[in-house]
């Protein structure tokens, strides 16, 4: 017996009183709160909105951001949490290059946390698709590193993933 006690990492979701019901909000540009209000008119049961705001734009881990303060403020006024979505499919980039190099991976994490704090987001939703098999370990390392920073900043980390198939 070494006396070591492993730290506990409870999920932010453990303290929730209600089930998470998230909807994605596809953005074609910067949109303010009026766009959200129109999109949510008549919608019930949703308590988290995930706007497609952050796009990996180069192999150095830089992001293009469509985030908007008014959108977040309106969402919060409507009782919605905002989990900004980051994706890798819009620009001609190499997800493997970004995630396999410590410098670019670290920069990507820093960018995401910076924007999350600047725009007072409640979480980050990761939607990385078409990930090559050789990027698997780098992706897991990225999620580890991002999860540490999210936890330190009281941000929910959500990951979109599909059910694996024989061809994936």
Question: Where do the model's predicted regions map?
Answer:
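Chitinase-like catalytic core of GlcNAc-active glycosidases
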Residues: 15-30, 55-168
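Alpha-helix termination/capping residues and helix-transition junctions
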Residues: 40-46, 118-121
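Non-catalytic propeptide/linker segments at domain boundaries
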Residues: 1-23, 33-42
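Mature extracellular/periplasmic domains of secretome proteins
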Residues: 37-43, 113, 168
């Amino acid at each position: 017996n070494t006396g070591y006690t492993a730290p506990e990492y409870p999920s932010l979701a453990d303290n929730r009183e209600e089930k998470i019901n998230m909807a994605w909000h596809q953005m074609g540009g910067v949109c303010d709160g009026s766009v959200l209000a129109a999109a949510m008119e008549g919608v019930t049961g949703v308590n988290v909105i995930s706007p497609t705001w952050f796009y990996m734009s180069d192999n150095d881990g830089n992001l293009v951001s469509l985030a908007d303060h008014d959108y977040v403020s309106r969402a919060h006024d409507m009782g919605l949490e905002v989990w900004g979505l980051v994706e890798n499919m819009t620009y001609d980039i190499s997800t493997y290059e970004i995630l396999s190099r410590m410098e670019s991976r670290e920069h990507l994490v820093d960018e995401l946390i910076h924007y999350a704090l600047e725009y007072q987001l409640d979480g980050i939703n990761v939607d990385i698709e078409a990930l090559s098999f050789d990027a698997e370990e780098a992706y897991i390392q990225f999620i580890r590193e991002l999860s540490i920073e999210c936890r330190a900043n009281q941000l929910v980390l959500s990951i979109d993933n599909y059910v694996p198939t024989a061809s994936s």
